[in-house]
């Protein structure tokens, strides 16, 4: 067990929107340290969303809110059986899980270009449909089903 909690990293705001949330998203999107390519994918994705005559950044943030899980289930061993215990997720972790969920579901889509995959997944999450939203709903259903064990501490 670690002695001290690790310090949370301070992120620089991104060059266009001056938003640290965008930088965090781009860091999760990045592969093999290629940050400029990740920024290009994100900005192309936002411009693709703006073709629907709406503010791309607002749609992206609302899609993140729609995909964000509020509870999760964690396994705990009690009396020889594993029990799924629903627990609250801290706000910082909620955002991280939402970002990773959105990106992983976008990577599984069938479009050719990554920015189009990401744009389609963001738009579907904005409309409360799509793979990422379904996964979030499944997480919440599991937590609801195991609500009886919520009194157990993890």
From Swiss-Prot:
Origin superkingdom: Bacteria
Family to which the UniProt record says this protein belongs: Belongs to the universal ribosomal protein uS7 family.
This protein's name: Small ribosomal subunit protein uS7
A Gene Ontology biological process term: translation
Ribosomal protein keyword on record: yes
Record InterPro entries: Ribosomal_uS7, Ribosomal_uS7_bac/org-type, Ribosomal_uS7_CS, Ribosomal_uS7_dom, Ribosomal_uS7_dom_sf
GO MF annotation terms: rRNA binding; structural constituent of ribosome; tRNA binding
Pfam family, one: Ribosomal_S7
PROSITE patterns, per database record: RIBOSOMAL_S7
Subunit structure: Part of the 30S ribosomal subunit. Contacts proteins S9 and S11.
HAMAP family: Ribosomal_uS7_B
């Amino acid at each position: 067990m670690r002695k001290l909690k690790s310090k949370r990293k301070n992120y620089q705001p991104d060059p266009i929107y001056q938003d640290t949330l965008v930088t965090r998203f781009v860091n999760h999107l990045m592969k093999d340290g290629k940050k400029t390519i990740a920024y290009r994918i994100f900005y192309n994705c936002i411009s693709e969303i703006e073709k629907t005559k709406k503010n791309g950044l607002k749609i992206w943030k609302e899609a993140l809110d729609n995909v964000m899980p509020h509870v999760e289930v964690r396994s705990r061993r009690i009396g020889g059986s594993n029990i799924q215990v629903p627990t609250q997720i801290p706000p910082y972790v909620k955002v991280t899980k939402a970002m990773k969920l959105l990106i992983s579901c976008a990577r599984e889509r069938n479009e050719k270009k990554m920015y189009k995959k990401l744009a389609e997944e963001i738009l579907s999450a904005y409309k409360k449909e799509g793979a990422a939203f379904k996964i979030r709903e499944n997480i919440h259903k599991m937590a609801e089903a195991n609500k009886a064990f919520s009194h157990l501490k993890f």
